[in-house]
A protein has these predicted regions:
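Nucleotide/phosphate-binding catalytic cleft detector across ATP-hydrolyzing
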Residues: 1-172, 180-300, 307-362
Length: 362
């Protein structure tokens, strides 16, 4: 899935017709914020984390500095992800974080108010859309256009959305997974589910706590998933792959090191992976037969950071008998799709939602 192709060639209407130098594409994710700048490409990739003082709510750090505090802060400091499962959990902190990142990307000379194309989960409500638009307006954005996350991911991995042909994209973020069937630039069937990166991490935390009475943090669980996680039962040699894990003994309260094997992490992830595959199957069952036939021929594309789980395409193929592959750079698929719309907004006007329906400025 290399290369970039156009979507439906819809003439611009003035609002969309010409990109400006400081126009941006934004992937505001649960775990990371990525920004694409017109004419420059990907200019920012930072953790969506804010560290605050617990009593005063004073912001102490944002992005990388805040991420380093996760699980390591004293009791008076909290490291918070202001977005949960793809939606805004803390309006004020999301605003502060976005303004910080925008100021870092745009020079003061250019910051006359950019226009922004932002991705949103396919199941997001009008109220949640309006919250995002208000946050961007408060952060200094001139105008916001929303792009369904599956469409952004499809553009980013190089799908030609002009075709009267069924394609399936499964975009796996930290908080949410968007499953969508796309044809002629429109989402025909979709589902947003929580079987995503954080859900996998939580399953690892629970498994290790139950089996070893060992408490580990979310960052440790993520590293375990990256290093030895697998969606398929490991072969003999692979099953013996192990890594030392440091946690806190639930009984004594003292630090302890435990060796964890790949076979154990497969057991921890077996049910979450099965639930994800079941959700993909549910979308396929609701898909019109001709489009489903196209997908059986052409396969499923995985994007998003959580798509990096080892042997996940193989697990999907084994269960559904449909070819499955991962985008070349799954973490950037969505923001690159937003960037494509930013570079040629007139051609993608039919995909963009200006969010005006029932919108009220807060």
């Amino acid at each position: 899935y290399n290369g970039v192709y156009g979507a439906k060639n819809v003439p611009g209407n003035g609002e969309y017709a010409m990109a400006q130098l400081n126009d941006l594409g934004i992937d505001l994710g649960t775990s990371n914020v990525l920004i694409y700048q017109q004419g420059k490409g990907l200019v920012l990739r930072r953790p969506a984390v804010v560290a605050i003082e617990r009593s005063t709510k004073k912001v102490l750090a944002i992005g990388d500095d805040a991420q380093r505090m996760v699980g390591r802060t004293p009791s008076n400091i909290m490291a918070i992800r202001p977005l949960k499962q793809g939606t805004v959990a803390d309006f004020e902190l999301t605003n502060t974080m976005l303004r910080f990142f925008l100021n870092g990307v745009l020079s003061k000379r250019l910051f006359s108010g950019p226009r922004v194309v932002m991705s949103v989960p396919s199941g997001v409500t009008e109220t949640e859309k309006h919250s995002l638009i208000n946050i961007l307006l408060d952060a200094g954005v001139k105008r916001t256009y929303l792009l369904d996350r599956p469409l952004a991911a499809a553009l980013g991995v190089g799908m030609d959305l002009r075709q009267r042909y069924g394609r399936m994209i499964v975009d796996m973020g930290a908080g949410i997974t968007d499953i969508a069937v796309i044809s002629e630039g429109e989402i025909v069937q979709s589902s947003s589910v929580y079987y995503a990166g954080d859900y996998f991490d939580d399953a690892i935390v629970r498994y290790i706590r139950k089996k070893y009475s060992l408490l580990i943090g979310e960052r440790t669980a993520e590293q375990i998933k990256i290093n030895i996680g697998t969606a398929m039962k490991p072969e003999t040699d692979e099953a013996n792959l192990a890594m030392p894990v440091v946690g806190r003994n639930q009984l004594s309260g003292l630090p302890r090191t435990q060796e964890i094997h790949a076979a154990e992490i497969y057991e921890a992830l077996k049910d979450p992976v099965a639930a994800l595959i079941g959700s993909i199957q549910d979308v396929l069952v609701r898909t019109p037969p001709q489009l489903a036939s196209d997908i059986f021929d052409d396969g499923i594309v995985l994007s998003g950071g959580a798509a990096g789980l080892a042997r996940l395409p193989e697990a999907i193929y084994t269960a559904l008998h449909i070819p499955c592959g991962v985008a070349d750079d799954p973490q950037t698929s969505v923001v690159l799709g937003c960037g494509i719309a930013v570079e040629d907004p007139g051609a993608y006007a039919s995909l963009l939602d200006d969010g005006r329906k029932g919108f009220k400025r807060l």
